[in-house]
A protein has these predicted regions:
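Glycine-rich ThDP/TPP pyrophosphate-binding loop and its adjacent helix/strand module
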Residues: 1-34
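Conserved acidic residues
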Residues: 6, 104, 154
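Short, amphipathic C-terminal "tail helix"
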Residues: 147-149, 153-177
C-alpha cells in the first residue's frame, strides 16, 4: 500500500511473534522515524512492565545458558490464563534490548477486557481469533479510539491469528460470565525477583 505505519502493535509472550512483526521497521526507527512499537502483555505475566533486565535461563529448570532479557525470573509461577503462550517468564534478548533502549513501549491487559475486544472484532469481521490476538485487538481499539478523539490519522499495523481449532472455551467462558482476570502472583513474583538482588 506504499504507506508506513505509525503504530505497530502485537501481543507478546517470549517475543518471537512480536519481534518478527516489528523487525522490518526497526532500522527506520533507529534512524529516527517515529514508528511506535507497542507490546501487549498479559497482566498476570508482566515481564516487560514489571520485570527486570538481567541474565536468566530460558527454561524453568535452569538447564539452558543464561541470556540477557527482561524477566520475572524462571521460578515465577504465573496464574493459569487461557492465552498460555503469554505465560512465559521472559522476553527474547533482541526484543528486550530494544525495550531497554526505549524503542518499544509495553502495556498489560487482563483477560476480560481483551476477550471482550476479541468478541467485538469477531462479530464485526467474522474471524474467530486466537487468545493471543485478542490482546492485540484490545490495544488496537484503544489506539483507534484515541485517534478518533484527537482527529489523528495515524496508520496502525497489527496482525491477528485465527483460532487453530474449534475450541470455543474463551468465548463460552466470557459469555457465561465465568471468565475472570488473573493478577500477577505477588508472593511468587517477590520470591522469583528476589534472586536478582545485587545483580541489577
Amino acid at each position: 500500500v506504499n504507506e508506513a505505519p505509525d503504530y505497530v502493535i502485537g501481543s507478546i509472550g517470549a517475543g518471537s511473534h512480536f519481534g518478527g512483526l516489528i523487525a522490518p521497521f526497526v532500522p527506520a526507527r533507529i534512524q529516527g522515524r517515529d514508528t511506535r512499537f507497542v507490546a501487549v502483555e498479559e497482566a498476570s505475566t508482566p515481564s516487560l512492565t514489571r520485570g527486570v533486565y538481567t541474565e536468566e535461563s530460558a527454561d524453568a529448570a535452569g538447564l539452558m545458558p543464561q541470556v540477557p532479557m527482561y524477566t520475572l525470573g524462571r521460578e515465577y509461577a504465573p496464574p493459569g490464563v487461557l492465552a498460555g503462550a503469554m505465560r512465559y517468564h521472559g522476553v527474547a534478548p533482541i526484543v528486550s534490548a530494544l525495550y531497554r533502549e526505549k524503542h518499544i513501549s509495553a502495556v498489560a491487559h487482563g483477560q476480560i477486557e481483551s476477550y471482550s475486544a476479541g468478541l467485538m472484532f469477531t462479530r464485526a469481521e467474522g474471524i474467530v481469533l486466537s487468545p493471543l490476538a485478542m490482546y492485540t485487538v484490545k490495544e488496537v481499539i484503544e489506539q483507534a479510539l484515541r485517534c478518533k478523539e484527537t482527529g489523528s490519522d495515524d496508520t496502525i499495523l497489527f496482525t491477528v491469528t485465527p483460532a487453530v481449532s474449534t475450541d470455543s472455551t474463551p468465548y463460552d467462558s466470557l459469555l457465561d460470565g465465568l471468565l475472570h482476570d488473573e493478577k500477577a502472583e505477588e508472593a511468587s513474583l517477590k520470591k522469583s525477583l528476589g534472586r536478582f538482588i545485587g545483580r541489577i
